[in-house]
A protein has these predicted regions:
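Catalytic cores of nucleotide-sugar-dependent glycosyltransferases that transfer UDP/GDP/TDP-activated
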Residues: 1-271
C-alpha cells in the first residue's frame, strides 16, 4: 500500500518519483502483460565465478514509472516470499545490488533512494561501500523505513560474505553483525542517511527493549536521524462512498449505521 500510494502523492507535488521492484512472475498478468523490455546487463554477484543476468522491465501506472528487476532464477515464484529465509536473503541481496547497478543503465540519478524493510536493507550498505567510489552515486542519499521491525533478514555471516563479497570487517557488532549472525535490516539502519517509521509513537516505542526487537540500542544511537511519519491512505482507492468492494456505501453523516450494515453483509458472506 505504501509503495503504491506514496509515489502518487509525491508525484502530485511535482517530484520525479520512480519505483523499482522485483519482476515476480506471480504479479497478475493484467499488469505483467503490459511491462515492456527496457534493457539488460550482466552483474557480478558475490563470490560467484560467473556474472548474473539482470533484466529491466518498465511499466507506467497512474503517472508513475515502475521498473522491475528481472531474473527468473530468483523471481520465478508463486508468491513474493518463500518458506526459506536463507533463500529469500540471497534473492534480496541480489535485488539490492541490481537496483543500484541498474540506475546508470536506466539513466536515472535519484537524490534519495527510499528503502522499505529488511528486503531492501542492503541498498544503503552497498551505496556506502561497493558503489561508493562510482561518481554516478555521489550525492545520492538513502532513507530506511521500518514498517515491521520484527522481520529483519537474519542468517549466518558466511552466507552474507558469499553473496555480498563485502569485507569481513563490515560484519562487526557496530555494523552488520547481530548475535554472531548477519542482519540485513540492521545493515540498512546503520548505513542509511535517515530512518523513518510509520508513526511518531512507534518511533519512540522501538527505542525501548520491549518494542525494539533487540535493535533498540542502535535506534537510540541513531535517534537524531530517526523520525516517525504517520501512514496515510489513498482516498481514491479506500473511499467508503465509492468503494466497489464493500456492500454498503456511507459518508461521515451516516457512517455509524451504515458501517454496521456493511459489517453484517461481510459476515453473511463468510457464513
Amino acid at each position: 500500500d505504501v509503495v503504491g500510494a506514496l509515489p502518487k502523492a509525491l508525484y502530485k507535488g511535482d517530484y520525479d518519483v520512480r519505483v523499482i521492484l522485483p519482476n515476480y512472475t506471480c504479479i497478475p498478468w493484467e499488469y505483467r502483460g503490459k511491462f515492456r523490455y527496457l534493457n539488460h546487463f550482466y552483474m557480478d554477484y558475490g563470490q560467484r565465478s560467473e556474472n548474473m543476468f539482470v533484466g529491466i522491465m518498465q511499466y507506467e501506472y497512474e503517472g508513475i514509472t515502475f521498473y522491475f528487476i528481472d531474473n527468473e532464477y530468483y523471481f520465478k515464484c508463486d508468491k513474493p516470499y518463500t518458506d526459506s529465509i536463507r533463500w529469500d536473503i540471497e534473492r534480496y541481496i541480489f535485488f539490492c545490488k541490481a537496483v543500484l547497478a541498474a540506475m546508470p543503465v536506466i539513466g536515472f540519478h535519484p537524490d534519495i533512494i527510499h528503502c522499505h524493510d529488511w528486503q531492501t536493507g542492503m541498498i544503503p550498505v552497498f551505496l556506502r561501500s561497493t558503489f561508493a567510489s562510482h561518481s554516478f552515486y555521489w550525492g545520492t542519499k538513502s532513507i530506511m523505513t521500518i514498517h515491521n521491525l520484527k522481520f529483519q533478514g537474519v542468517w549466518d555471516i558466511k552466507h552474507f560474505l558469499y553473496n555480498t563479497n563485502l569485507p569481513r570487517y563490515m560484519f562487526t557488532p557496530d555494523k552488520l553483525e547481530f548475535k554472531k549472525d548477519a542482519n540485513m535490516l540492521k545493515g540498512g539502519l546503520v548505513y542509511a542517511d535517515y530512518i523513518t517509521t510509520v508513526s511518531e509513537t512507534y518511533a519512540e516505542e522501538i527505542k525501548t527493549p520491549y518494542y525494539g526487537e533487540q535493535l533498540d540500542g542502535l535506534l537510540c544511537a541513531r535517534s537524531r536521524s530517526l523520525r516517525g511519519i504517520l501512514n496515510g491512505i489513498d482516498y481514491t482507492v479506500y473511499n467508503p462512498e465509492t468503494d466497489p468492494k464493500i456492500s454498503v456505501h456511507y459518508t461521515v453523516k451516516d457512517a455509524v449505521e451504515k458501517k454496521k450494515e456493511a459489517k453484517r453483509a461481510l459476515q453473511r458472506n463468510w457464513d
